[in-house]
Amino acid sequence: VSQLIELIEPTDRGVSATAETRGQISALIDRLEESWRGSDAFATENEALLFRRNEVAYVGQTSSVSANAAGGKYRGRLGRLVFRTDALFQHVLLPDVAVNVIQFKLLGLIPGAAVLKGRWSVASEEARSELRRNSTRALSSNCVAVDFDAPIVAFGRTGGALTLELGPTSKVGLDVTYLDERIRICRGGSSGTPFVFRADSCADGAPLADASNQWQLCVERRPLQQSPAAFATFAAAGLCVTGWLPVSRWFALPMAVA
């Protein structure tokens, strides 16, 4: 695990990883997954490892030119320029809360966050079949199904400046393939893309402990609904960078669960 963390740390969550580094990371992920095969992610002894706050540390996606499985358009080439990523989180919490969060600085100056909050459940066999879509990879009994609410986009780190609700609801799957005290490894339900999540960086007293909790203040605020007025405010904030993509599409893409 230490070797895996050492390899992924300088890769900007996988975006800048070379083909050689990506191959080394993939081999380590495969080895850890194989060592954990047959384990029950929902067993009592694993609850403390599964249900906690996590930083998205790595996404095994070969190209992030237009979008990334963790962060959607925010983490595409243009998105990374406009919305400079400060932090990226995914939390699976008891009793049934799942949260994806990207914290950014608009044009490197204005802090903000995009938050997807939803409800998780253990995916049934029928649900796993639906979540696979066209993937050839079978999903295990450790798969989580998440029903996400409409995305919330907040300006000011906790939404104090402006909070908007933009985009549709969504349903996604995430197959848990490895757990230990430091990390969680999962595969996207429909893509099979590997994700590495770090819990040690979000634990109480760790560098990202406070930031990983700020999503709660964002979702507690009453957002403006999607409307012409909201879009006008949105554009005034400098976010209308969508000559090639409708505004709501930037916030409709689930993060780290594709």
PLM ranges: what are they?
Residues 1-258:
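Soluble ligand-binding/transfer domains with enclosed cavities or grooves
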